[in-house]
């Protein structure tokens, strides 16, 4: 049975999750998008700011933007741990035990910062 968990409500988007999927809503298009979670995947954080948001799971990060629509995933390595998630109007920064990655509102993927 599907159970709804937390949600993040922002002026331009909504990010929410259940035990089976993550939901993203683009206010500008009036459009919902979903991505399925894996059988052992759980959402630990939902963070957003401005036009961009991210769902953090035990297996990956899922970036969502009001501009590009859809979810853009980044898989974690086996021993990688999320240390911090910070955001600005057009980007989310995720710091892990092994790298820093950025998802920008106008992009269709994650960028690793060295």
Residue ranges and their predicted role:
Residues 1, 30-36, 70-76, 110-114:
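A short beta-strand motif characteristic of beta-propeller blades
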Residues 100-113:
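Short, low-complexity, Pro/Ser/Thr/Gly-rich segments in the mature regions of secreted, periplasmic
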